[in-house]
Amino acid sequence: MKVSMIVPVYNAEHALFDTLGNLVHQTFFDRYPEEGEILFVNDCSRDRSGAILEILHSQFPDRTRIIHLTENRGPGGARNVGVENSTGEFYLFMDCDDIASPSLMEDLYLAVTEHNPVGSHAEVSRLDSDREYDIAIAGLNCRYLNWEGFALKREFSGVLDEKKKSYLIASEADFRSKIYRRSFMEKYRIRFAERVMAEDEDFSAIVHANVRKVNVINKILVEIRDVEHSASKSLDIASTYEDILNCAIRAYQGMRKCRDYDSFAKAAETLYLRRFAFCLKTLDGLYQDSILTEKAYFEMMQTLRKLSDTMITHSVEGNEWSNACLEPWEKEKMIHFLRDDVMAQMKHEQAGG
C-alpha cells in the first residue's frame, strides 16, 4: 500500500455530506488502483456519523475502512488509532469537516516520492546516498483565520537549513496539508497527544523540529472550514487555558530532544511565547470576571513565570522570529511579564502593599 488517509470523525453528520465526496473520489485511486485507502475512525459519535460511514463503505469497499472506537480518545487518539491500523508507506490526515481537493492524495504522493531534489549541485551530491523526502507540504485556505491561499514557496524544498527549519516552526505550518513518510515518523516516535485539544500544534512543531528534507507544492489542496459544531467550539475558557499551556510544554519536551535544538531555539521560543501570551490573557480575563480568586490568580501566574524562565532563554526583543511572527499585543504582554520585577510587584500588591 502506498498511501493511507486518516480521518477522525466525531458527531459530524452535519458536515459529512459536504466533505465525503471529494475524499472517496480522489484521483489517486484512479491512477494507483488498490494502492490507497481512507481510514475513517469513528470516535464514539453520538449522532448518525457511524451509520453514514457504513453506508459510504458499502458503496466504496475497496477505498474505505471504518473503525468504530468503543472509548472516546479525542481527535489525537483517533488519528493515532488510524496510523496504527493503516498500511500505507505514507500517510496524511484530514479533518472530517474540511474540504480536500480531489487531487490531494495524488499531488502529495507525487511530491514526497519525487526523485529530483530541488537545490544546488552541492546539496544533491551530499544527498546522493539518501534522496528521500520526510514529508511533503501543500497550501491551504482558512478564511476565518485569514489564511487565504497560505502556501510555502518552492524554495523551501530540499534539505532544511537553520533558517528554513526555524521558519517552519515559528510560522506553525498546519498538519492537514502534509503527507508523512511512515519510516520517518516511526524513527522519531511522533504521535498525537490524546484526549486534549490543540494536539495538532505540538505535533506539527515536533515534526518540523525533526524533519530533514521536505518537498513543497505551491498549490492549495485543503480548505479548512469554520464549522459551528466542531469540537474546538465546545470548550470552556478554563479547559482551553489548560490545553494551550500543556501544548507548549509538550512542544518544548518534544523539540528539546533534538540534537540541533539550539539552532532553532528562537523559533521554538516564539511558539511558546504565543501560547504563554494567550494563557496570560486568559488568566487576566478570569480574574477580572471574579472567576479566579486573587490567590489562585497569583499562583497560576507564578506557575507560568517558572515555565517561562525554563523555556525562554532569549530576550523577546532580540528574537528575530518573535519580532516577525508574534502579534504586537503578544510581544508586549510577554516583554512585560518577563521583567525581573513583575512577580515581586504582584506579590507586594497581593499583600496589600
Regions found by a protein language model. Give the residues of each.
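Short aromatic/hydrophobic "clamp" motif used to bind/position activated sugar donors
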Residues: Y91
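A conserved acidic beta->alpha catalytic loop
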Residues: N22, N42-I52, E71, S101
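Short, well-formed alpha-helical segments that are part of the catalytic scaffolds
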Residues: A12-T27, I52
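Membrane-interface aromatic/basic loop that binds lipid-linked glycans or pyrophosphate carriers
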Residues: E132-Y133, G285-G353
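Cell-envelope/extracellular polymer assembly enzymes that use nucleotide-activated donors
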Residues: K2-S4, E37, D202
